[in-house]
Amino acid sequence: MANEEVILLDFWPSMFGMRLRIALAEKEIKYEYKQEDLRNKSPLLLQMNPIHKKIPVLIHNGKPICESIIAVEYIEEVWKDKAPSLLPSDPYDRAQARFWADYIDKKLYDFGRKLWATKGEEQEAAKKDFIECLKVLEGALGDRPYFGGESFGFVDIALIGFYSWFYAYETFGNFSTEAECPKFVAWAKRCMQRESVAKSLPDQPKVLEFVKVLRQKFGLE
C-alpha cells in the first residue's frame, strides 16, 4: 500500500499505546508518532476520538481507530500480507486470544493501578488480586514460549506493555513478581529480546519516576 499516512496519537507511559507501537514495529509499518499532553489534549485527539477523548488513537489515511486491542486487530487485517501474522489462523485459537486480551484489559490494569494509587487494606487486597491474575495468566501460558505457542503474537502484544510498570507495582506493592510468578517473568524477558518490544517499552525506572509524580498529585507521597 503506497503513499499511506499512518499516525499514532500516544503518551509514552501508556501500556495501551505500547501495543500499537509493537504491532506497527512487527509489521514494519512506518508511521508518525505524536506525543499527547493529556492535561492539554490536542484538537486532533479531540477530533479523532470525540467519544472517549483518550489515547492511543491510530489514524490511517485520515480515519481514526480507537481502543488499542481493536487497533491491533485492524493493523493485522489491513497489513495481513506483511509477516508476521499477529493473530492465529484458526478461528478457535483467535477466539481464545481475544478472550485473554479482554481478561488482561478487565483485570490487570485496575489491579495494577490500585497497587500504586491506594494504601493500607485496599492496596493489600489489590496486591493479592494482581498476583492471582498473573498466576491465571501463567496457567494460560503453560509451558509454551509465547501465549500463541511458538510465535510471538496477539496476547503477548496485549500484555507485555504492563511489564514496563512492574518496577513501580513492586516498589509500592512491596512484592517480587519473580518470586511469585517466575514463569511470567521468564516470558516477559523472552519478549523483551524482540526488537519491536525493546524499542517500544520505556525503561522501568523511568516509569517509576512518572508514577511517583502521580502519587504526589494524589497526595499519597
From Swiss-Prot:
This is Probable glutathione S-transferase parC. Residues 90-214 form the GST C-terminal domain. It comes from the Eukaryota. GO terms for cellular component: cytoplasm. Keywords: Auxin signaling pathway, Transferase. Conjugation of reduced glutathione to a wide number of exogenous and endogenous hydrophobic electrophiles. GO terms for molecular function: glutathione transferase activity. InterPro entries: Glutathione-S-Trfase_C-like, Glutathione-S-Trfase_C_sf, Glutathione_S-Trfase, Glutathione_S-Trfase_N, GST_C, GST_C_Tau, Omega/Tau-like, Thioredoxin-like_sf. Induction: By auxin. It catalyses: RX + glutathione = an S-substituted glutathione + a halide anion + H(+). Residues 4-83 form the GST N-terminal domain. Its EC number is 2.5.1.18. PROSITE patterns: GST_CTER, GST_NTER. Belongs to the GST superfamily. Phi family. Abundant in seedlings and roots. It is also found in the shoot tips, flowers and leaves. Glutathione binds at residues 14, 41, 55, 67-68. GO terms for biological process: auxin-activated signaling pathway; glutathione metabolic process. The keyword Transferase applies.
